[in-house]
Amino acid sequence: RSLYRRGFQRETLLELMTQAFYQPNIKLLKSRYEKNCRLLRKYPYCFQQDFPAFEELPLRFYPYDDQRYIPFTAETETFGEPLDLRHPVISRNFFQNLDKPVLAADVYSQYELEFLRDNVRKSEWVGRENHVYLHYTDWEIFCAYLQVLNLRPLLEEEKLVFLIGDEISQYPIDFQARFGIDYSRYP
């Protein structure tokens, strides 16, 4: 990667790295992507449904070791910094305004997504709308990360609401008006 960044035989190095690290993992990455797309198509609080084909995703993830990936942007042919999606660090304060449901932008860490799932009580338990709103500014980048995230455990309790781009204007959603769910009846 270092030689590649410096421009040393970029084409040859990219081909070697792709053959050694990316191609052996394409089947797994594609399978995970397709599984996550299927889950989101059935999920009631993901309103975008136009998932790009796997081959059209703007990022490829080259496994770095068992836990980390190096993202590669195909358009610019550049490698990013290594990512550890399970690194146990919370990068921001998700609970700044407790008067409204949590709103977090561009969360791509599996660890942070699981943290939000585990630390925000269900709307039924608090008697008011208390979902976690995840705002993703770029649909294609969000879709690219579906290759490396595991959404199944995150979606089971239906706590998450995915807002893409301009859908942020829907925050917070009136669940009673839109879905016929009155959380004030629950506790």
Q: Model-found features: residue ranges?
A:
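N-terminal donor/sugar-recognition subdomains of glycan-related enzymes
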Residues: 2-187
